[in-house]
């Protein structure tokens, strides 16, 4: 459909920014057992990797291929149920303490780990062990579970049961074990090492098939390329906090610095609500109840599990009783309005450990984290957004959303069963 009429389906600016393709994917992710240990490349790495594998004559559909396109794949997960996630390298001292507590085959890695920049190499060394070496590492971790903090042993023990000969279990020791409650979200940029362990969530991401896996999977792994993309950032990974906005009553926003990655949650129990308007298309997904959509020329009812596509600049009103998730593709100009807010909000995230059974004098580990924000994005002040609005010549509200005040495009909403 998009290829036949990219301007109509995407809008002029989105088509100019991304070409004749939908740059955003929205899906529900159900995790019954640990998913792969993975990271996603940056645009530069994806471009280089695609060219290299093309030159080698590897079919783009081949299962042993790592790069299938030239795009980055930032993503965001928002929990619908309780979720467990491994995300980002934990504090360096914590990682050192855990490796030493296990001892045995992990002691050499503990000695090598002296600064954050050593972490990618440690990951590569562990994941490059032969199968017998990986089995010995996991066996040592299993033997040491009783000596690890409970929140670490519970998470790592379950992974070890599933993958008894995969050194990804040891890499899991180096990652933050994060618990998400319904409504909590995590934004994962390029180079963030992560693994989803359990739960149900709504996931929005840039449209790319580039996944660099290192372990905990029967699928193709590419340890050298995975290590190349990893950064040395350590410490608890901040959650993306839902932000209300007076201009859009009843809508909670989850924003990121990536124009393709953003969510809005609309919980309907009373009056109808206008879906925020952008110059790009809108994806709508109902996860609870029944929602009624109305545009200029069409009405549509969606129940839980159904989705719809809103045309660019379309004015869509939702009513009913249920929960609707909205993914909107922002033009690059619109997305720039949110950069300042995202980085300012990230700077004020604070964390506290969930574990109460940790003897810090012995291991010094605050291992499982929940995040709180001391203020919301919408409270950071509108000045920077208004400046962007003036530069682009558009009427822009506090969240940097273009109103398209001069023209409401008659949007067609199409349902997907």
Question: What are the roles of these predicted feature ranges?
Answer:
Residues 372, 399-401:
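Methionine residue identity
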Residues 340, 355, 367-368, 404, ...:
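Cysteine-centered motifs
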Residues 349-352, 357-359, 369, 385, ...:
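Intrinsic-disorder-associated, low-complexity terminal segments enriched in Asp/Asn/His/Tyr and depleted
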Residues 1-182, 194-284, 288, 294-296, ...:
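Active-site region of the double-stranded beta-helix
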Residues 178-185, 296-313:
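Short acidic-glycine-tyrosine-enriched beta hairpin
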């Amino acid at each position: 459909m998009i290829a036949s009429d990219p301007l109509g389906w995407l809008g002029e600016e989105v088509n100019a920014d991304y070409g004749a393709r939908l740059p955003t994917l929205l899906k529900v992710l159900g995790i019954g057992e640990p998913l792969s240990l993975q990271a996603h490349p940056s645009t530069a790495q994806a471009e280089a990797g695609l060219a290299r594998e093309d030159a080698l004559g590897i079919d783009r559909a081949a299962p042993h291929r790592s790069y299938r396109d030239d795009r980055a794949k930032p993503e965001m997960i928002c929990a619908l149920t309780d979720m467990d996630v491994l995300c980002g390298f934990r504090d360096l001292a914590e990682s050192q303490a855990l490796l030493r507590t296990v001892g045995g085959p992990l002691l050499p890695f503990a000695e090598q780990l002296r600064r954050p920049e050593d972490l990618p190499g440690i990951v590569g060394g562990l994941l490059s062990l032969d199968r017998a070496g990986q089995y010995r590492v996991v066996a040592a971790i299993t033997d040491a579970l009783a000596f690890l903090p409970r929140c670490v042993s519970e998470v790592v023990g379950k992974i070890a049961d599933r993958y008894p000969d995969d050194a990804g279990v040891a890499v899991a020791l180096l990652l933050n074990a994060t618990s998400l409650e319904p409504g909590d979200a995590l934004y994962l940029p390029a180079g963030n090492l992560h693994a989803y362990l359990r739960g149900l969530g709504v996931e929005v991401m840039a449209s790319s098939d580039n996944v660099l896996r290192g372990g905990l999977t029967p699928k193709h792994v590419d340890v050298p390329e995975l290590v190349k993309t990893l950064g040395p950032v350590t410490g608890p990974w901040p959650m993306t906090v839902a932000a209300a906005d007076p201009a859009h009553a009843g809508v909670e926003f989850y924003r990121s610095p990536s124009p393709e990655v953003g969510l809005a949650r609309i919980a309907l129990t009373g009056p109808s609500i206008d879906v925020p308007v952008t110059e790009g298309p809108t994806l709508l997904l109902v996860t609870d109840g029944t929602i009624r959509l109305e545009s200029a020329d069409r009405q549509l009812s969606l129940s839980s599990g159904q989705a719809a596509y809103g045309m660019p600049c379309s004015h869509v009103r939702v009513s009913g009783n249920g929960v609707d998730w909205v993914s909107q593709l922002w033009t690059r100009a619109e997305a720039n309005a949110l950069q300042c807010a995202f980085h300012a909000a990230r700077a004020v995230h604070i964390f506290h450990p969930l574990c109460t059974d940790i003897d810090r004098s012995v291991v010094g580990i605050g291992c499982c984290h929940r995040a709180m924000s001391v203020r919301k994005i919408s409270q950071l002040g509108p000045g920077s957004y208004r400046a962007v609005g003036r530069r682009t010549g558009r009427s822009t509200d506090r969240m940097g959303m273009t109103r398209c005040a001069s023209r409401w495009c008659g949007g067609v909403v199409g349902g997907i069963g």
